[in-house]
């Protein structure tokens, strides 16, 4: 439980705690400590979201979304 393959995650819509769609995960960056979800926003920006339990609150593969605690204007 809580383990997903990259192909499960890529393509998910990222939705924040205010139900704002932040974008779509386009790739996963592997780092030494935790993965980072590279998310393409509607305006073309890239949002780098760390794959941490305190940030990612839900992953729903069946419905195609990931819920995160993230301000839509937050910079990395």
What are these regions (language model features)?
Residues 1-76:
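Peripheral interaction segments used for macromolecular assembly
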């Amino acid at each position: 439980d809580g383990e997903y393959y990259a192909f499960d995650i890529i393509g998910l819509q990222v939705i924040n705690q205010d139900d704002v769609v932040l974008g779509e995960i386009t790739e996963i960056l592997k780092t030494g400590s935790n993965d980072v979800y590279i998310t393409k926003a509607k305006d073309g920006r890239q949002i780098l979201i760390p794959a941490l339990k305190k940030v990612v609150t839900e992953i729903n593969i069946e419905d195609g979304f990931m819920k995160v605690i993230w301000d839509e204007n937050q910079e990395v």
